[in-house]
Design a protein with these regions (language model features):
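Acidic/His- and Gly-rich active-site-bordering loop/insert found
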Residues: 1-61, 70-85
Length: 85
């Protein structure tokens, strides 16, 4: 996001991966949330079509939650580009 011209504040709420990115000033104000959460007991190795946990009993991502952060960043960049036109 910094490469796209956003101001990025990292490490919010005591979490090193938490951030807020801002672009521009004035109105409209548009907010986009990207979140990752984990569900219990679904740790899974990538690209393995059968149950094969990375860590037995550990949480993992499901239901598309693993794509929300990437989609949020793409949306923020698209909105910024539209605002700049």
């Amino acid at each position: 996001l910094e490469q796209e011209g956003f101001s990025v504040e990292m490490g919010l709420a005591g979490m090193p991966t938490c951030f807020v990115a801002s672009y521009g000033s004035g109105e409209p104000v548009i907010g986009i949330l990207g979140e990752y959460d984990a569900l219990p007991m679904i740790s899974q190795k990538a690209l393995v079509p059968v149950r094969d946990p990375l860590v037995e009993g550990a949480p993992g991502h499901g239901c598309g939650h693993n794509t929300m952060g990437t989609a949020g960043i793409a949306a923020a960049i698209a909105v910024k580009n539209a605002m700049d036109e």
